[in-house]
């Protein structure tokens, strides 16, 4: 939750700057992001190029693709016994059809898929929480106790436990909302708006909904159902 609050401020700043320093490319689309406001705002061209290079590498080989596809393929294999190769091929084809259509097709696909995806996920989570409402207090208590386990206080280990809890929370929070990573500003720069401040405010709500609302519900569902202690 703390990461979400700090991330909201970060997301606001980076998306505001993305709209403020964006440019129109030769195809007529708005392009922006950290590499643009680093070059046009700070005037450090070499750093902007370096960010763009590492941004491409991360998008291709890092958190931009591998974790998501890995989660989908293994979920299909574990739940429906669908071979990983088949699921990966289908995902690749579908994603290629959307990406090759450019920014507009990506926006249209996101406008259709994301609302239904989010609504279905949140609705299912709420139903599970309502059905198991009597377990909510114990689940919340377990989450808090697990973060600061008093049994780990032997030999000064409590400091290490707190440190690991913070590291884990920060890593998962940033991975979830992407605040400060530079990916969100690239998308925000393509927004059809002339108000950088407004876009910054809109972008920061995504961090709140994703990390504070959705991640909290996910954690409670995992604890209530016992899935956290029995991944299978």
List the predicted regions and their residue ranges.
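Re-entrant/interfacial helical elements at transmembrane boundaries that shape
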Residues: 33-36, 70-71, 182-191, 221-223
């Amino acid at each position: 939750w703390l990461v979400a609050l700090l991330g909201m401020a970060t997301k606001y700043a980076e998306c505001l700057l993305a709209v403020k320093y964006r440019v129109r490319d030769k195809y007529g689309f708005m392009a922006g992001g950290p590499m643009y406001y680093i070059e046009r705002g700070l005037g450090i061209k070499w750093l902007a190029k370096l960010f763009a290079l590492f941004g491409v590498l991360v998008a291709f080989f890092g958190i931009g693709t591998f974790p998501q596809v890995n989660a989908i393929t293994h979920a299909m294999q574990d739940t429906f016994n669908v071979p990983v190769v088949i699921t990966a091929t289908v995902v690749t084809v579908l994603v290629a059809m959307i990406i090759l259509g450019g920014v507009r097709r990506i926006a249209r696909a996101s406008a259709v898929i994301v609302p239904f995806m989010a609504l279905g996920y949140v609705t299912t989570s709420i139903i599970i929480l309502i059905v198991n409402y009597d377990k909510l207090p114990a689940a919340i208590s377990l989450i808090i106790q697990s973060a600061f386990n008093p049994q780990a206080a032997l030999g000064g280990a409590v400091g290490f436990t707190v440190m690991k809890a913070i590291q884990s929370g920060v890593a998962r929070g940033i991975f979830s909302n992407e605040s400060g990573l530079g990916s969100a500003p690239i998308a925000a720069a393509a927004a059809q708006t002339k108000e950088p401040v407004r876009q910054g405010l809109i972008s920061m709500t995504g961090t709140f909904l994703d990390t504070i609302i959705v991640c909290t519900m996910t954690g409670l569902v995992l604890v209530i159902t016992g899935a956290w202690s029995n991944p299978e």
